[in-house]
Amino acid sequence: MTKRAEAKYKIDRRMGQNIWGRSKSPVNRREYGPGQHGQRRKGKLSDFGTQLKAKQKLKGYYGNISEKQFRKYYAEAIRMKGDSGDNLIGLLERRLDAVVYRAKFVPTVFASRQFINHGHIKVNGRRVNIASYQVRVGDVIEVKEASRQLTLVLEASQLAERDVPEYYDVDHGKMSAKVTRIPLPNEVPYPVIMEPNLVIEFYSR
């Protein structure tokens, strides 16, 4: 197991929020961070601290993306036309692992990454095993026919704790999803408030 995969159990506690809306989140059981000093009262964050936390939360939500890769998303977001914060969310939501997770083909974004790496996903009829692959509007994502009866897939499609966003056209009978448009941040079903503009400010210092 990679360090990033192991860290998923600590992300909620470090942020002090249930960022995926999971019923088994450790935040539901205690309100302090991980480690022996987790119960210390935290002081007011500086502007830098607030920006850093916003970055860590967004990066963690999408599977604890590496700093190098996340910085590349920032660089691309500021090069694009329009609001850089909106652009950043659009890029993250077009990651293949995010799409597979949003379509409810798997229960978590971490499971999505592993599912893709193991070759269970096709994009426009071709197998893609790169979790960071950028999906485009109109692309059709599907679970390979041989993988559609996996318990992981069948259980995920029935999850009641989250709904499929309106910017996807999903058919769980065929285990396929089509990206209909790029969402704005306020359309993305985050269980907690995300602040992409603070992330842009962090990297723009």
Swiss-Prot record:
Gene Ontology BP annotations: ribosomal small subunit biogenesis; translation
Residue intervals of the S4 RNA-binding domain: 94-157
InterPro entries: Ribosomal_uS4, Ribosomal_uS4_bac-type, Ribosomal_uS4_CS, Ribosomal_uS4_N, S4_RNA-bd, S4_RNA-bd_sf
Highest taxon listed in the record's lineage: Bacteria
UniProt-annotated stretches for the region Disordered: 20-46
Short name of one Pfam family: S4
GO cellular component terms listed in the entry, alphabetical order: small ribosomal subunit
Family membership noted in the UniProt record: Belongs to the universal ribosomal protein uS4 family.
Task of the protein: One of the primary rRNA binding proteins, it binds directly to 16S rRNA where it nucleates assembly of the body of the 30S subunit.
Assembly with partners or alone: Part of the 30S ribosomal subunit. Contacts protein S5. The interaction surface between S4 and S5 is involved in control of translational fidelity.
Protein name as it appears in the record: Small ribosomal subunit protein uS4
Species assigned in the record: Beijerinckia indica subsp. indica (strain ATCC 9039 / DSM 1715 / NCIMB 8712)
Gene from which the chain derives: rpsD
